Amino acid sequence: MLDLKFVRSSPDIVRHALINRNMSTELIDSLLEYDIAWRKCLTEGDELKHKRNVVTREIAKLKKENKDTLSKIEEMQGINSRIKEIDDIIRDYKSKIHEIMLRIPNIPSSTTPVGKDENDNPVVRIVGEPRKFTFTPKPHWEIGEALDILDFEKGAKISGQGFTVYKGMGAKLERALVNFMLEVHARQGYLEVFPPVLINEKAMTGTGQLPKFKDDMYLCTDGYYLAPTAEVPVTNLFMDDYIEKLPVFLTAYTACFRREAGKHGQDTRGIIRQHQFNKVELVKFVKPETSYDELEKLTNDAEEILKLLKLPYRVVNLCTGDIGFSAAKTYDLEVWVPTQEKYREISSCSNFENFQARRANIRFRTPDGPQFVHTLNGSGLAVGRTVVAILENYQREDGSVEIPEVLRPYLGGAKEISNEVKT
């Protein structure tokens, strides 16, 4: 959430940011109207309370002098009635202002390029060369079904479209990747945590998923939301709290749940876009002056997984029209998918500055008083999409899949997934 004082003093900066995000400026216009009315009511309320104090003293004086107080008491009743009306109006304006503030996105950083959509995202670097196949590569879903390690039919049978059952070496590969990613990030200095995946509304609001993305979330009947990403529970570990020692680096594996699988006809086959998927997350809490250096380091930490797996990828700097609601700056890591002949997102690494911390009230102490921390996070990585990249980039002509060398210790030394080695 932005600082209301900043919005009030620099409305044109916020309007410009909304325009660059391809958004209407109606929100800021409505906010400023309510803010003016709210402050006017605050002034009137203060004046009425001052007047009430004056009348109270006048009544006391009249009583002391045994004089008639009826007119002053009637005046006091009128003042009290108006104060109650004003207080109700103030509460209503304050609620409306808060609701609008929750819907205003973060202001992109000066190093976030201006653009309309993903086509305007500049490439920062390309790492690795896409493999040149001597045969026509198969998509991951065909490989998975042929090797009997991915069962889309059973997933649809027990849950519906957008769910998959991993079997045998498929399940082991998924688990191996989770363990591998967590161990790499632990060596990088992140503390592993294992948080709940049922999240309350306050926590979902703190990281910016609510209210804007409510329709993309799974809401349980008792009011809990299923975590769309580990970013939510991990960031909110410090909700309404002070962090006594910065920086704090955390990593977590969770299952994630989103309603968007196969939306608009995209990725309706395979496991690139699922309602339930696994992800390893990186989260940082840092001082404001270090947050952009820490974004570069966090991005490098996520990249290390791709480098160790020897998967070709690129890094793009998201433009203002593509960046997430809460982010000030984001790098996407995109892994090469041979059968699509393009790079696909496998991680987003973002600096939120104090946007999330202000919503979740996460602070640290300074000699000048409390300040909001800066929060950052990134996928390290999306596990299912890493499986996609391995199956497609490491496939062989005979239908088997080579296991990346770095994963073999996590799979009992197995070197391949084939119809002979499936369990």
Swiss-Prot record:
Binding-site list for L-serine: T229, A230, E231, E281, S379
EC number: 6.1.1.11
Protein origin, superkingdom: Archaea
The UniProt record lists the keyword rRNA processing: no
Cell compartments where the protein resides: Cytoplasm
Recorded metabolic or biological pathway in which this protein acts: Aminoacyl-tRNA biosynthesis; selenocysteinyl-tRNA(Sec) biosynthesis; L-seryl-tRNA(Sec) from L-serine and tRNA(Sec): step 1/1
Quaternary structure and partners: Homodimer. The tRNA molecule binds across the dimer.
The protein's role, per its UniProt record: Catalyzes the attachment of serine to tRNA(Ser). Is also able to aminoacylate tRNA(Sec) with serine, to form the misacylated tRNA L-seryl-tRNA(Sec), which will be further converted into selenocysteinyl-tRNA(Sec).
Domains (record comment): Consists of two distinct domains, a catalytic core and a N-terminal extension that is involved in tRNA binding.
Family from the record: Belongs to the class-II aminoacyl-tRNA synthetase family. Type-1 seryl-tRNA synthetase subfamily.
Entry protein name: Serine--tRNA ligase
Lineage, top ranks: Archaea, Methanobacteriati, Methanobacteriota, Stenosarchaea group, Methanomicrobia
